[in-house]
Regions:
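P-loop NTP-binding module
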Residues: 1-282
C-alpha cells in the first residue's frame, strides 16, 4: 500500500469525528497563475530584524471565530482537541512552524487556521503567530478586521520591517502577520532566501507559527515552502473534496511532514473533524 493510501485509510479508520458549527467557503479567487518550480531569483535584502514591537490593535473579529467568541462551545472544544492532537503528533520533534492548506479552494483552511491559532494562543505563556501566506487569496486580515498592509510580501521584498508588519491582538494573546499586497510571483517569493531568513528569525520569538497557504492544486506555493517548515495540516471538505483531489494534493508533498487530515463538512449544517496523528512517518 502506498503512503498516500495509508494516510487516507487511517483517516477513515482512526480519525475521531465531532460535530460543530459549519465553516463557510472562502471568497472568490483573485487569480491563480500556473504553478512552476521556484526559480532562483535575486531578492532585495530585508531590513534588519529587530526585537519585534508589533502594533497593538482592537480587532473586529469575524463571528465565526468561535475560539474567541464562544470558548465554551462544542465547536471551540474541537479546536482544543485538534491543538492537543497536533502536540501529540510531535513525537519528540519541535513543531514550531505549521502550514495549513487544502486540496482545493473553499475547504475552510483559513477559518481553521484562525481558530486553531486563537486556541493555541490561549495556552499559558504561549507565544503564537498567525501568518497569512496565501499571497493569492488572502483571508486572515478579513477574519480579524485588519488591514492587509503592511504585511508578509512587504517584508520579503524589503519594503517594510517586521516591526511594521506584525499586529498584536493583546486581548487574544495572538500576533498576526497579514499578507501584504499581492505579488506578481508569489511562489518565488515564498521560496526565497528572504522567506527562509524570516522564518528562522520568527522561530526564535514565537512558540507556534501557523501559516495559512493557498490550496495545493494546481499551485506550487506549498511544495516550495514545505522545506522551510516543520509540519502540515491538510483541510478536507468531507463529502465534497473528491478522493482523487486529496491523493493528487498529497502526491506532491513530503509526506513525512503531513501531520494529518482535518475533515470539514460545511454543506450539511455541521462540521466534522477526523484527525490522525499516527499518519505521520517517523
Amino acid at each position: 500500500m502506498s503512503r498516500i493510501q495509508e494516510i487516507l485509510k487511517r483517516a477513515e479508520r482512526e480519525g475521531s469525528v465531532h460535530r460543530t458549527r459549519p465553516f463557510a467557503a472562502e471568497g472568490p479567487a483573485v487569480g491563480s497563475p500556473s504553478a512552476a518550480a521556484a526559480a532562483t531569483v535575486p531578492m532585495p535584502a530585508m531590513p534588519p530584524l529587530q526585537a519585534p514591537e508589533p502594533r497593538s490593535v482592537e480587532a473586529a473579529l469575524d463571528r465565526r471565530l468561535v475560539a474567541a467568541f464562544s470558548p465554551q462551545s462544542l465547536a471551540a472544544e474541537q479546536y482544543r482537541s485538534l491543538r492537543t492532537r497536533v502536540k501529540s503528533a510531535e513525537h519528540g520533534r519541535a513543531m514550531r512552524t505549521i502550514v495549513i492548506t487544502s486540496p482545493n479552494k473553499g475547504d475552510g483552511k483559513s477559518l481553521t487556521a484562525a481558530n486553531l491559532a486563537l486556541t493555541m494562543a490561549q495556552e499559558f505563556q504561549h507565544r503564537v503567530l498567525l501568518v497569512d501566506g496565501d499571497l493569492r487569496r488572502p483571508a486572515i486580515h478579513g477574519l480579524f478586521g485588519l488591514s492587509d498592509t503592511p504585511g508578509l510580501s512587504d517584508v520579503l521584498r524589503g519594503g517594510a520591517s517586521i516591526d511594521d508588519a506584525l499586529v498584536a491582538l493583546p486581548e487574544h494573546a495572538l500576533t498576526i502577520l497579514p499578507s501584504g499586497p499581492l505579488p506578481s510571483h508569489p511562489a518565488e517569493l515564498l521560496g526565497s532566501t528572504a522567506m527562509r531568513r524570516l522564518l528562522e528569525t520568527l522561530r526564535t520569538r514565537f512558540d507556534r507559527i501557523l501559516i495559512d497557504m493557498p490550496p495545493v492544486a494546481p499551485l506550487a506555493d506549498v511544495s516550495i515552502a514545505l522545506g522551510m517548515v516543520d509540519g502540515l495540516l491538510m483541510i478536507v471538505r468531507a463529502g465534497v473534496t473528491p478522493k482523487p483531489a486529496i491523493e493528487r494534493a498529497l502526491s506532491g508533498l513530503d509526506l513525512s511532514k503531513v501531520l494529518g487530515l482535518v475533515l470539514n463538512d460545511a454543506g450539511t449544517g455541521s462540521a466534522s473533524y477526523g484527525y490522525g496523528h499516527e499518519y505521520v512517518a517517523g
